Amino acid sequence: MEEFVNPCKIKVIGVGGGGSNAVNRMYEDGIEGVELYAINTDVQHLSTLKVPNKIQIGEKVTRGLGAGAKPEVGEEAALEDIDKIKEILRDTDMVFISAGLGGGTGTGAAPVIAKTAKEMGILTVAVATLPFRFEGPRKMEKALKGLEKLKESSDAYIVIHNDKIKELSNRTLTIKDAFKEVDSVLSKAVRGITSIVVTPAVINVDFADVRTTLEEGGLSIIGMGEGRGDEKADIAVEKAVTSPLLEGNTIEGARRLLVTIWTSEDIPYDIVDEVMERIHSKVHPEAEIIFGAVLEPQEQDFIRVAIVATDFPEEKFQVGEKEVKFKVIKKEEKEEPKEEPKPLSDTTYLEEEEIPAVIRRKNKRLL
């Protein structure tokens, strides 16, 4: 049997405690075809991980004790060891950078690593996790500020909100299971990209297509759905285009997509056409869609749809029960007049760029 090898070099870097945990989970799950790295300022946390490639940063500034929930310390730690980071990124085609936002190392160091990767010509995708609502508005404010920096430093980014875990299952999740679900998002995103690139296909999709879709793509959605039976097309598309784990959670309005369909050999062309029509109806009318198709001879009455969607006209985030929209300001656009900002509360979140630093400090004192 012919063995297919991934022609592109993909690395996954977990930054800080949350990001490193996600990468460690991938290592324990035995993901293949990628190199895994955990980067942290906290030596004790690194020692608990099984992933082989563990890198300490910021020894001088943190003495191995962590960043103390201060993003500026995490940033300084990354800059202290920038040569070490560049060495890790050498000979890389694509990098996923995973970080939990709202703390110190992930929030501060991840944007530095992403910026370095992008400057080296590497396709850079950030996978960022926002904190639970019960962690308070101050941590969320810090996380959103870190996300802004990460957005500017990456080609594309995927945002997960911890509070959305409860939407994944009807059963009661344990704490361990809940965080496993969060960690699995990174794994599924990486597996999705690698499977698209290396799987022999009737209509092939290669790494150049992945780059076309994700490069400078901004907010991204990666969805996958499977279906069988009479309603298989509806089921597969609905699962693929709606991702409750992810912020934005819909492909509506996307202007760049990569769609791969796996089908059993008994599936008629009409079903594939129906799937693509349904996807077309949900995205921008002039969206650029790269299409791939894979036959699954061992399956029967089966269809799977994988979608990578980017280049959205507006970024939508769900924070607690409030939807917050972040307008994507293009260079040719002008910002609309700003309203007088209001103090933050546990139920109200303002756009980070709309709050002057002096007001933010005042609001923090009011809390």
UniProtKB/Swiss-Prot annotation:
Primary localization class, coarse: cytoplasm
Record GO terms (molecular function): GTP binding; GTPase activity
Binding site for GTP: 17-21, 104-106, 135, 139, 183
GO annotation (BP), single: FtsZ-dependent cytokinesis
Keyword Cell cycle: yes
Domain of life according to the entry: Bacteria
Gene Ontology annotations for the cellular component aspect, listed alphabetically: cell division site; cytoplasm
UniProt entry tagged with the keyword Phosphoprotein: no
Keywords: Cell cycle, Cell division, Cytoplasm, GTP-binding, Nucleotide-binding, Septation
Subcellular location: Cytoplasm
CDD domains attached to this UniProt entry: FtsZ_type1 (cd02201)
Record InterPro entries: Cell_div_FtsZ, Cell_div_FtsZ_CS, FtsZ/CetZ, FtsZ_C, Tub_FtsZ_C, Tubulin/FtsZ-like_C, Tubulin/FtsZ_2-layer-sand-dom, Tubulin/FtsZ_GTPase_sf
Pfam families: FtsZ_C, Tubulin
Function statement: Essential cell division protein that forms a contractile ring structure (Z ring) at the future cell division site. The regulation of the ring assembly controls the timing and the location of cell division. One of the functions of the FtsZ ring is to recruit other cell division proteins to the septum to produce a new cell wall between the dividing cells. Binds GTP and shows GTPase activity.
Subunit structure: Homodimer. Polymerizes to form a dynamic ring structure in a strictly GTP-dependent manner. Interacts directly with several other division proteins.
Family statement: Belongs to the FtsZ family.
Protein name stated in the entry: Cell division protein FtsZ
Organism: Aquifex aeolicus (strain VF5)
Organism phylogeny: Bacteria, Pseudomonadati, Aquificota, Aquificia, Aquificales
